[in-house]
């Protein structure tokens, strides 16, 4: 089996309301690039990359000169053609490789009549739980709906998602308001959904590294009684101004 064509299409996924975070806002959509890898046997494998537009599509068109005629089973050779350990540091090559590798694995699964997990070593679980991903949100500028700013709005939104999809874990993206206000909202969320059998649902928080060490410690101590899965990136990575003795978790974990 040989690759005969590579196509890339930008896809925008609409958001029901703008999502707020420490870096600003996702205003109306998520952008992705869907990649199709076609072969001489008529099979088409699908992959995906974050981001998109003219530049992303042009990158995948350029990959045709490297990969047309290539056997999609030769994944390591493809990796060294596109993203060897030196070149992979530049121009998002690892993202491009990941989308193409995914498409090639899809092709191999189709050709061999097996699921991709068998190619990668076998399935370990029958089910994989998903968590709700909660954001503070602006109201949709067109409809005025979807705002999440208060603790009451956050809890109502989390309950809606739980009712619709059955989530038992809930991650809140912070770094938008003062840590004390976000603590109030997070505790309200845990108070509403954290009770019941087996201590109820679990919770996760991520302020995108905008807190000081002191703020992070204060927040962490204030939620020790919550069923936390993790506290993600409370401070900037490799915070040179922090005292290593302030943390009981090694900095190498990134937490």
List PLM regions with ranges.
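Catalytic domains of carbohydrate-active enzymes, especially glycoside hydrolases
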Residues: 157-173
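N-terminal small/glycine-rich loop or linker at the start of catalytic domains
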Residues: 118-147, 185, 198-202
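Active-site mouth loops of central-metabolism enzymes
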Residues: 90, 129-155, 174-175, 207-212
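Metal- or metallocofactor-binding catalytic centers and their adjacent structured scaffolds
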Residues: 6, 38-112
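Catalytic core of soluble alpha/beta enzymes
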Residues: 174-255
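Short, charged beta->alpha transition segments
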Residues: 115-120, 154-161
